[in-house]
């Protein structure tokens, strides 16, 4: 696992993919410290990818991890656009179908874990299939 460099050094020392993987690993550890259980990472289905799938009790949690160096232009959370939400919903729908489930049969939610500079914001149930 790549180490997350000190603030501001990320883009110079790691490729975009390596930096993303490092932030996702940090997100996983942070969420596990909050009691969530890891299910899968970087789940790819036709048309999209889910960064993390976790379990919070009986709830399946689809997590989008975002990092921005600063809060300028809205910060990390603001980068999860309506279009991105639709892609995540579609990807989750396909993943659930592979698990013999659906939004109707599985208790699930969509969280965003946003790293902006040195701050972490956890947006539980940030959006849903009724948004």
From Swiss-Prot:
Belongs to the UPF0102 family. GO terms for molecular function: nucleic acid binding. PANTHER family: UPF0102 PROTEIN YRAN. Signal peptide: none annotated. This is UPF0102 protein YraN. It comes from Salmonella typhi.
